[in-house]
Amino acid sequence: MFAQLDTKTVYSFMDSLIDLNHYFERAKQFGYHTIGIMDKDNLYGAYHFIKGCQKNGLQPVLGLEVEILYQERQVLLNLIAQNTQGYHQLLKISTAKMSGKLHMDYLCQHLEGIAVIIPSKGWSDTLVVPFDYYIGVDQYTDLSHMDSKRQLIPLRTVRYFAQDDMETLHMLHAIRDNLSLAETPVVESDQELADCQQLTTFYQTHCPQALQNLEDLVSGIYYDFDTNLKLPHFNRDKSAKQELQELTEAGLKEKGLWKEPYQSRLLHELIIISDMGFDDYFLIVWDLLRFGRSKGYYMGMGRGSAAGSLVAYALNITGIDPVQHDLLFERFLNKERYSMPDIDIDLPDIYRSEFLRYVRNRYGSDHSAQIVTFSTFGPKQAIRDVFKRFGVPEYELTNLTKKIGFKDSLATVYEKSISFRQVINSRTEFQKAFAIAKRIEGNPRQTSIHAAGIVMSDDTLTNHIPLKSGDDMMITQYDAHAVEANGLLKMDFLGLRNLTFVQKMQEKVAKDYGCQIDIAAIDLEDPQTLALFAKGDTKGIFQFEQNGAINLLKRIKPQRFEEIVATTSLNRPGASDYTTNFIKRREGQEKIDLIDPVIAPILEPTYGIMLYQEQVMQIAQVYAGFTLGKADLLRRAMSKKNLQEMQKMEEDFIASAKHLGRAEETARGLFKRMEKFAGYGFNRSHAFAYSALAFQLAYFKAHYPAVFYDIMMNYSSSDYITDALESDFQVAQVTINSIPYTDKIEASKIYMGLKNIKGLPRDFAYWIIEQRPFNSVEDFLTRTPEKYQKKVFLEPLIKIGLFDCFEPNRKKILDNLDGLLVFVNELGSLFSDSSFSWVDTQDYSATEKYSLEQEVVGVGMSKHPLIDIAEKSIQTFTPISQLVKESEAVVLIQIDSIRIIRTKTSGQQMAFLSVNDTKKKLDVTLFPQEYAIYKDQLKEGEFYYLKGRIKERDHRLQMVCQQVQMAISQKYWLLVENHQFDSQISEILGAFPGTTPVVIHYQKNKETIALTKIQVHVTENLKEKLRPFVLKTVFR
């Protein structure tokens, strides 16, 4: 029977449409018993192909296509692994090829267990190679020219499932080669997956011996994987068990903990670790963290369930005492649930490459590698790549891809988005392109590198998996799942920005304050830091900076660190339903149900609410007598909602509880509660470790806010300016002679750096800093290198006021810039001896200057116009920070954004405003009636007095606006004798509606009144109308 050997898969990137799952399915439909893959150079899909075939009842045949230079000739070879030994040879051959090291001598040394096929298209009778081979023939091979001494074998290339796929493969070739469709060669036909019986009949008729050769070749092929654990030996000169025991005992003694119950807990953990064969693993992790600390890196408090291990704590792998904080080792490692321990190594992200080099040097470049991942055609990428080949311009591509949401597939966005569907259906070529994009969506596009994963082995990695070359170290061809399935140790080296932040803050405090802070020793009950959490002032704090977490903190108002840990667990679907119960029980407003005195100590810290997975385990241990190992199996069954296992466990739980004298009804009720909570219960060890890191960050924000914002603004891509301003920091004006490159904070002043100016070359910024001081605008331009004498570089410097120290009129400098540049280029160094004729012009207003600064660096650097308005205001208003819910208030604000919607009931327009008063932000709602009145006045960036009712929603204050008044510093002042003509004046003012506030001063009783319901448009006509009734009018 025919066997399909030469199948290119999607791992021959953009040269095939054969994905493995559909390959198995179609192969069975077409009657195949044996199928193969033969990707070019690589074995990316080999493991999943072999396992998938075995699962689907198919015989796998693993092949590899390589081209090799021999006797000044490129020879194309198809290599077939005939057995497990051949499989291992292919691992080495592919690695050599993907590392640029494959040559004929190496190949010949690794052909044991491998059959070689040379396709007939690449064969000639002059070809002489130092090994036996088959000649691969297809339906179109002219057999009359074949060497009668050579064995023939059927070999048909497959790249797609059906002829309809040819157009899509043609598109993939165009994308791969970055060509238009017209420039891309047409795809070969007859490379679809054909019916097995038809091909069998063909070869039986035309070349029966070739078919027999094929059957003989594949008949005994079988591959076996070695899945045994292959941990590297940490120290070959000493027992790992002994070394681990010595190090952990020394660690506890150093911490002053060589006492009970620590000693017995340590012995218990060491026995389990040794019995499971993981002594070397812990020593390796310890060694890696020791390396980081020896370099002065802050390595964090650990993460995940590893924080429940006393061995990890004794080795300083984690920074949490699991005995003191009641964390469970069995949640981490359990003899009744054999799995690799999973200790992720957190490290400052800027030092990750240093760790990779250490691993490579310490354990050997042949014994360690990074792990591959595969970048796929996402919906946006597929649309962009395909539509571009149909000649769609960039702006149309951008508009189309903007309609695709983060979680959308092309099918879902087409179904739910009317505008997207309209664009696709607007042209025939768009419909065609969309069909192709859907076909390639999800297929691998290229390789990438796992963000964290490193694989390590006791022996050479290529004995087990294929590799390819990389920058810092070799990279696996197998993904993380296949790597671990082959018994190899995968470790995650997670570069965390937050560790970088903490370390940089520690260093800056030492430099600026002369204070050495031991991060790991920060008091987790520090009152000032707890107060920060209670206020929800956690922008920039790991795990707590999203609105949901901030609002939850404001509700819970944590009073101790344990409640911060609880907040991370309550901030999850399911658990959040119990937030109100948690708060009321803590405040004594709701009864705490501890169910049974025997489990009361377990539930008391969380007020009778099961928040943590460990609580479920402890209850099973105490109430039903389960071992913690067995309790962990129960926890896993509940988390995974394994109904069959849970039912079995429930009967076991109740029987064991009854044996201990518990009531059956109570036991069943307790089990149901455990079952419910375990579905979303959080890992307490992980919550504790990450809350500790969050607390450390918050400690710096609470005690050293200038240091905190300095580091966050310079090392984070997020915007912390608004948060800093709300914390009473101010953005200071800088000059060309004082502006730093990075942001700088001193004495509550923020000095924005040159790095914030979009599009400013770094080299130009460095040049400015090195060359200053400058004496004038002319001096600066004269000395500026010609390559930087461009308006695109110079205008932003002028707009943010860097030359105000020489010439405060920014508009004047900008208007004269063309002339200045011509003058500089014509006179060069003579500029200083000549006089440039400046053309005068009126400067920007303060508001315009502030807007220019926001445009260039994202924040105003000069005095905020709103501050000037506030200083001159005669109208009373309340700062946003002092608003009280359920009160009437007037606020003086600037509108940041306006969002207009239509109500569902009446279809009328209403608006949501986001506003600020330079210190804090506020959400404002204008319902249809108010919006209809004021909509023509509202404009983003303008200043207003808003009057309304203060409400609370989602634990945040917002205003329901009733009245809007423009807040401009210019007012129309009327001086009148007395109140005699008030009605006439009011009538005249009402006839000239506008946005200028009116203030009336009564000379007789010295009374001044700002009109709240009348604003005017000031004209000469208005002035004439008022003349008979007023002593004087002033517009200022």
Swiss-Prot record:
Family assignment? Belongs to the DNA polymerase type-C family. DnaE subfamily.
Designated gene of the protein: dnaE
Protein name (record): DNA polymerase III subunit alpha
Q: Which reaction equations make up its catalytic activity? A: DNA(n) + a 2'-deoxyribonucleoside 5'-triphosphate = DNA(n+1) + diphosphate
- Gene3D superfamilies on file: 1.10.150.870, Bacterial DNA polymerase III alpha subunit, thumb domain (1.10.10.1600), Metal-dependent hydrolases (3.20.20.140), Nucleic acid-binding proteins (2.40.50.140)
InterPro entries linked: DNA_pol3_alpha_NTPase_dom, DNA_pol3_alpha_thumb_dom, DNA_pol3_finger, DnaE2/DnaE/PolC, DNAPol_HHH, NA-bd_OB-fold, NA-bd_OB_tRNA, PHP_dom
On assembly, the entry states: DNA polymerase III contains a core (composed of alpha, epsilon and theta chains) that associates with a tau subunit. This core dimerizes to form the PolIII' complex. PolIII' associates with the gamma complex (composed of gamma, delta, delta', psi and chi chains) and with the beta chain to form the complete DNA polymerase III complex.
- The source's domain of life comes to Bacteria
* EC number annotated for this UniProt entry: 2.7.7.7
Give the subcellular location: Cytoplasm
Function field: DNA polymerase III is a complex, multichain enzyme responsible for most of the replicative synthesis in bacteria. This DNA polymerase also exhibits 3' to 5' exonuclease activity. The alpha chain is the DNA polymerase.
GO molecular function terms listed in the Swiss-Prot or TrEMBL record:
3'-5' exonuclease activity; DNA-directed DNA polymerase activity; nucleic acid binding
